[in-house]
Amino acid sequence: MKRAYAMPLTNPSFPPGPYRFFDREYIIITYRTTREALEAVVPAPLEIDEPLVKYEFIRMPDSTGFGDYTETGQVIPVKYKGQHGGYVHSMYLDDDAPIAGGRELWGFPKKLANPKIVHEGEVIVGTLHYGSVLCATGTMGYKHREADHDSVLASLAAPNFLIKIIPHVDGGPRICELVRYYLTDITLKEAWTAPAALDLRPHVMADVAKLPVLDIISAVHFKADLTLGLGEVVHDYLSDHNRLATSTTQPEKIRA
């Protein structure tokens, strides 16, 4: 038992880290949504800055321990004690190891689905199917203008935040934490901008459309090598002090 680190005990779904990614391809479409929609899902003590969402399609052809897979989801720009970062709201992917590892280690909100990134002539197309239902379609022009590398690197180096939830065996809460993590050892290989469009459709189990698209702000397409760093707990919702402080000030945000 001294060597146990993940489930199943004798044959875990993923190895210990570090987790290095090579030629990781991103298509990120930033769009404006309603502040009310964000307030319903962003938990305290995170703060919403502008009512923006980053919808991401990510192709990971080569990663240590996790293999070859594709992912998509929504990241919300937030602040934590004055520090700007991103709250990872939803993630959908097609590989068991990063789903198990992401949920167990960090608390990534990962679900099994079928995201795709394809290059069709002069357009990059990203899609998300949950079962047979098409839930998201993103399209972007192919490499129209080179993006500012410093801005892309700064966005990659910013902190990201997660809510890690693990229930007790009796069904009650056992772990409920705000986790912060970083991407490290980043090598940006190329970065491009172009016009983009995004369509989100309702689905009961893939509710990306609950953060509606009002207008597109920007889009960036890039490739990078990077390491997914392990996390740190910055807020424990179940500690007596934090439970009292949060419930006294913003009780609705604990439930979010």
UniProtKB/Swiss-Prot annotation:
Instruction: Give all cystine bridges in this chain.
Output: none
Name the chemical reaction catalysed here: acetoacetate + H(+) = acetone + CO2
One annotated GO molecular function is: acetoacetate decarboxylase activity
Catalytic residues (positions) = K110
Keywords in alphabetical order, please.
Answer: Decarboxylase, Lyase, Schiff base
Enzyme Commission number(s) of this protein: 4.1.1.4
Which enzyme class? lyase
Q: Gene3D superfamilies in the record, alphabetically?
A: Acetoacetate decarboxylase-like
Q: Which family, according to the similarity comment?
A: Belongs to the ADC family.
Q: Which NCBIfam families match?
A: PRK02265.1
What is known about what this protein does? Catalyzes the conversion of acetoacetate to acetone and carbon dioxide.
Looking up HAMAP family in the UniProt record yields:
ADC
Q: What is this protein called?
A: Acetoacetate decarboxylase 3
Which organism is the protein's source? Mesorhizobium japonicum (strain LMG 29417 / CECT 9101 / MAFF 303099)
Upper taxonomic classification of the species?
Bacteria, Pseudomonadati, Pseudomonadota, Alphaproteobacteria, Hyphomicrobiales
